[in-house]
Amino acid sequence: MLHRPLFPGTRPEETAHAPASRDLDIGRESIWISYRPISMEAFQPSLRIQFSHHRLATPVSPWERLKIGCGTPPILTRHGWLIVYHGVSEIETLNENPGKDPPTDGHQLCYSAGVMVLSKEHPQVIRYRSTKPVLTPTLPEECHGTVAHVVFPTGIDRRDDLGLPNRLDVYYGMADSRIGVARLDVPDTLPPGSVADSPEAKA
């Protein structure tokens, strides 16, 4: 199971502060992977019961420097398990729509989306990770709403029904007010220059 333990101080309604260092620590909001034996499902169906926990990824790139978290369910591709996850940074903004957008002090959290590919056999190993976001708030519907400057990936659909197994439709929240859909095409080879937290994750 992929999940993110929730730590105080980084909810959208709270003030954002950039971390003082790039040290990897438990307090950073990161993506974790947890396991449990399949044999447990017969008598304990709750996914809250896990026995093996590993930190999969922490914030690395500028667009995700405050925190990262899961997004779409993992979907199997030719390269491994693909997930579209969200990352959060802080941007300077002006309140362009008084009365419509929540008031700000000139700083705003910005939610963008990136791609991560995990090994098919060993999903705790990151094979590829976006150096830049694949989706970032640019449309008016993404920049203005209940929570401004948010794209939040949630659903994903492989279009086998159209005979296009390498086409993925990603459904995402737009400023917490609307639902959008974006197209993602799986390439023949993974792009170079992926980033990871550790040498082991680059395998």
What is each PLM-predicted segment?
Residues 1-66, 75-147, 160-168, 172-203:
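Beta-rich carbohydrate-recognition and catalytic domains
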Residues 70-73, 152-155:
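Beta-propeller and closely related beta-sheet repeat lectin domains
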